[in-house]
């Protein structure tokens, strides 16, 4: 029992060592474990179930929008990767290469896919002939490999799971609209399912995807004041279409190149959930994404009728929520701590006195509030409570983000803020790449996005003092 107690309690306080706090939660909440391959992880059932719920939401939305799922090869021939110059230069440092098949050296190196634009383009060039064949709306769920130098579970790994959408369209307007539609869906995923507020905006040319005309992003802020890119959607223009000779006959019978979009979210969203909502007691899961939304803990379960009533309660609640009954022989106090550490949104306690009074006790993970409810209406009350928890977690995350969002009008303010008050910094920018580079060199902060909701916090660029063009969110990032 002493060992069990230590397992539950031994989480490094986030204010003491945020990185270790994060690692402790990943391991102790049984989300993932390290593998023997540097930078790769084993996603355990608790972590994978969260990903499955993310998948379910995204996959349902994509199918509502008319997308179809496909599966592309994991290998890309080197000559294919070389076809789009900017693209290959952007990914070259991260590519893993296969040079041998068995004992035989391959005639051409094969890249282990870091992303699949080249494969989709090769396929689209074969199947598209007319505007009547458009749009093509494809998506795939897979893993990709990027040989990262610095890794951390979920946030930045050598191999990770994602969905990658690849669509081609007849017109620029249609493609741009589609790219923004997907970004909006990602925003809804984060806020409606993960209770995680995001800033929507456009990347600067320096930060956009390799080979893209425009990259749109959703940016979130973690507990420690660092930013995290939660999802991206790219308008690639006709760059890839021309490189891969994808052509179609337009409505006037002339040959044209389709306009391309690509977009993705990954398992790094699980890392974001940990760092936006977690506390020193462990993980805090938003109810709508939690694999188990409520756990029933029988109190004095050795007494007559307690386990039977708990089983009955589980059967009733299983019709409306994802519920678990823990009837193990561990002490209730240990169970409380364990499920708090694992982030289960709602705990339901029921013991002999509760049964006598036809009631149960609901305990919220987010703020530990207790509510007594009648067993006659427990299905409704539990569902209502889960919605309350979601809304409360979202509002708390918004409050934290807003409190850690600052304004800087010159470099002195910028440097002082980034060193002493980590968070988002809203500052004006002239549009010059040199200023963007200097800000990163001096402060370690990168441009996160030019938000769609622009405001003027100063007339001049925070770096050079010249006339400003855009408001930019800046920050140090994962």
Swiss-Prot record:
Pfam families (alphabetical): HGTP_anticodon, ProRS-C_1, tRNA-synt_2b
Keywords linked to the UniProt accession: Aminoacyl-tRNA synthetase, ATP-binding, Cytoplasm, Ligase, Nucleotide-binding, Protein biosynthesis
EC numbers, comma separated: 6.1.1.15
First-tier enzyme category under EC: ligase
Name of the protein in its database record: Proline--tRNA ligase
GO cellular component, one term: aminoacyl-tRNA synthetase multienzyme complex
Gene Ontology molecular-function annotations: ATP binding; catalytic activity, acting on a protein; proline-tRNA ligase activity; transferase activity
Catalyses which reaction(s): tRNA(Pro) + L-proline + ATP = L-prolyl-tRNA(Pro) + AMP + diphosphate
Matching InterPro entries: aa-tRNA-synt_IIb, aa-tRNA-synth_II, aa-tRNA-synth_II/BPL/LPL, Anticodon-bd, Anticodon-bd_dom_sf, Pro-tRNA-ligase_IIa, Pro-tRNA-ligase_IIa_arc-type, Pro-tRNA_ligase_II_C
Organism of derivation: Clostridium botulinum (strain Langeland / NCTC 10281 / Type F)
Comment block on domains: Consists of three domains: the N-terminal catalytic domain, the anticodon-binding domain and the C-terminal extension.
The keyword Protein biosynthesis appears for this protein: yes
Chief location of this protein within or outside the cell: cytoplasm
């Amino acid at each position: 029992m002493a060992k069990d107690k230590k397992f539950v309690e031994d989480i490094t306080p986030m204010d003491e060592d945020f990185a270790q706090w994060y690692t402790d939660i990943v391991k102790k909440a049984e989300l993932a474990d390290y593998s023997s391959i540097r930078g790769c992880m084993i996603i355990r059932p608790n972590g994978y179930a969260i990903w499955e719920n993310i998948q379910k939401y995204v996959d349902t939305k994509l199918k509502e929008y008319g997308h179809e799922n496909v599966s592309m090869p994991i290998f890309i021939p080197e000559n294919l990767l070389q076809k789009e110059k900017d693209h290959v230069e952007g990914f070259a440092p991260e590519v893993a290469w296969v040079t041998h098949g068995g004992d035989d050296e391959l005639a051409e190196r094969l890249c282990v896919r870091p992303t699949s634009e080249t494969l989709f383009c090769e396929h689209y060039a074969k199947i598209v002939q007319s505007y009547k064949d458009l749009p093509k709306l494809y998506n795939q769920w897979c893993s990709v490999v990027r040989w990262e130098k610095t890794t951390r579970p979920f946030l930045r790994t050598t191999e990770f799971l994602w969905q990658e959408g690849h669509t081609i369209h007849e017109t620029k307007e249609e493609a741009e609209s589609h790219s923004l539609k997907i970004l909006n869906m990602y925003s809804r995923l984060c806020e409606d399912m993960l209770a995680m507020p995001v800033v929507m905006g456009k990347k600067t040319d320096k930060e956009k995807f390799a080979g893209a005309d425009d990259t749109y992003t959703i940016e979130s802020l973690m507990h420690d004041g660092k930013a995290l890119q939660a999802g991206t959607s790219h308008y690639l223009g006709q760059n890839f279409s021309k490189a891969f000779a994808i052509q179609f006959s337009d409505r006037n019978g002339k040959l044209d190149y389709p306009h391309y979009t690509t977009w993705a979210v990954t398992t790094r969203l699980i890392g974001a959930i940990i760092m936006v909502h977690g506390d020193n007691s462990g993980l805090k899961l938003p109810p709508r994404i939690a694999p188990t939304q409520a756990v029933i803990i029988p109190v004095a379960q050795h007494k007559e009728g307690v386990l039977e009533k708990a089983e009955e309660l589980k059967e009733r609640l299983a019709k409306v929520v994802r519920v678990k009954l823990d009837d193990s022989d561990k002490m209730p106090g240990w169970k409380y701590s364990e499920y708090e550490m694992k982030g289960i949104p709602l705990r339901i306690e029921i013991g002999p006195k509760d049964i006598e009074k036809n009631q149960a006790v609901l305990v919220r993970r987010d703020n530990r509030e207790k509510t007594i409810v009648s067993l006659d209406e427990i299905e409704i009350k539990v569902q209502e409570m889960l919605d309350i928890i979601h809304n409360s977690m979202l509002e708390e995350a918004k409050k934290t983000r807003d409190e850690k969002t600052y304004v800087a009008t010159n470099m002195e303010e910028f440097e002082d803020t980034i060193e002493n008050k980590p968070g988002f910094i809203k500052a004006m920018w002239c549009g010059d790449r040199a200023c963007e580079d200097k800000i990163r060199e001096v402060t370690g902060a990168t441009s996160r996005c030019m938000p769609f909701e622009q405001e003027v916090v100063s007339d001049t660029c925070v770096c050079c003092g010249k006339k400003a063009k855009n408001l930019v969110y800046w920050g140090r990032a994962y």
